[in-house]
């Protein structure tokens, strides 16, 4: 199974605005889980938190297209191929594609003790639309 063997991410569709695709690259029951996640234009996941008693968190390796990453209380960060995002456990955040671009990243779940994911509210259309205005003013 390579990066091109993707399928519709139906199990998690309730946590996404728009259409996304999910391709596990490793066995989720093993020590480190990697998956290729592809977002259609304007698709994004809900705010969420990766919890862990110790360790945990997530790494995003940006592969193709243009995306967004935002932590609660901070400005959104534009993502480009080759960018790496380190997300510590306990940080509320979201990520997804820019308005007119597909976006793909490799998501790596960092090993930890008592890890879990908490899915929260969607990123609203108004919040998302404001990103383009911010990006246009601050390229």
Residue positions per predicted region:
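A short glycine-rich, His/Asp/Glu-containing loop-to-beta-strand
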Residues: 8-49, 53-56
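A short beta-strand-loop-beta hairpin characteristic of the jelly-roll/cupin
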Residues: 44, 54-81, 91
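Conserved hydrophobic/aromatic beta-strand scaffold that supports enzyme active sites
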Residues: 22-24, 34-38, 59, 76, ...
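Short, small-residue-biased leader/transition segments that mark boundaries at the very start
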Residues: 2-7
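Short strand-connecting beta-turns/loops that link adjacent beta-strands
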Residues: 30, 54, 74, 100-101, ...
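Acidic/histidine-enriched, glycine/proline-rich intrinsically disordered or flexible terminal extensions
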Residues: 114-139
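Ligand-binding loop in jelly-roll beta-barrel domains
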Residues: 68, 89-117
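Conserved metal-binding segment of the jelly-roll/cupin
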Residues: 39-42, 79-100
């Amino acid at each position: 199974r390579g990066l091109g063997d993707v399928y519709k991410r139906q199990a998690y569709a309730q946590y996404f605005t728009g259409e996304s695709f999910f391709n596990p690259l490793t066995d989720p029951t093993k020590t480190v889980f990697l998956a290729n996640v592809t977002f259609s234009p304007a698709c994004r996941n809900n705010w969420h938190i990766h919890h862990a008693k110790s360790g945990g968190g997530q790494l995003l390796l940006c592969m193709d297209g243009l995306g967004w990453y935002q932590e609660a209380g901070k400005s959104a960060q534009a993502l480009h191929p080759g960018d790496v995002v380190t997300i510590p456990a306990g940080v509320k955040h979201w990520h997804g594609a820019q308005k007119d671009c597909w976006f793909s990243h490799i998501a790596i779940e960092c090993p930890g003790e008592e890890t879990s994911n908490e899915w929260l509210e969607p990123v609203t259309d108004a919040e998302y639309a404001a990103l383009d205005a911010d990006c246009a003013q601050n390229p």
